[in-house]
Amino acid sequence: GDPEMILKALYDYYERCGNLPAPGLEEKEIGFLLVLSKEGRFLRFEDCRMGKNQAKTFLVKKHVGRSSAVAANYLYDNSTYVLGYADMDKDIEKNKDNEKKLKETLTKRNSKEKECLKAFTDKVNDICQACPNSEDLKAICQFYKQDKTDILNAISQDPLWDDIKKNLSKKYSTFSFRIEGERKITAEKRELLQLDAAEEDNAEDGL
């Protein structure tokens, strides 16, 4: 074989591989960002949707496997985890004339929201302790010092909230954080992702 051809084939191969996320990471569609102040105050939602059914992708830590178990993702997740708001408005609407059913649905929703929000908050606090110098994480930690009601009060003032609520079942309806003044979202900052050594070595090679 012609050495130049072989080199070209190798080069093309590396080019293709260069687009694969490093182990431990994945490209994730994230439809909405909570923009927080450095003090952890909710400022606004940032809409990252592109067209009708897609959103911008970010390179974040690989998602956790959960069939029905409660397990939080790394600084991003669905509304039940990040906002303590479950996508159950339709169920409530459907049962609104059946008092018993309605009560059951509301109870179920409430316990699901509490459990998932707590899992996400605990995860945020763990990450905060592991990376104590991160201003981003300090802000997110501060945000989660509020309870479910405070969070809902803050986000429901946002003009995007009604539209977000209607689209919670969409594939892109994942939420993450950007701190005001930062270009990157917190969940894609490599130095905060606590990749284990093998993942880190591969990440270095991928640069």
Language-model features, listed with the residues they occupy:
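Conserved phosphate-interacting/catalytic interface
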Residues: G1-L207
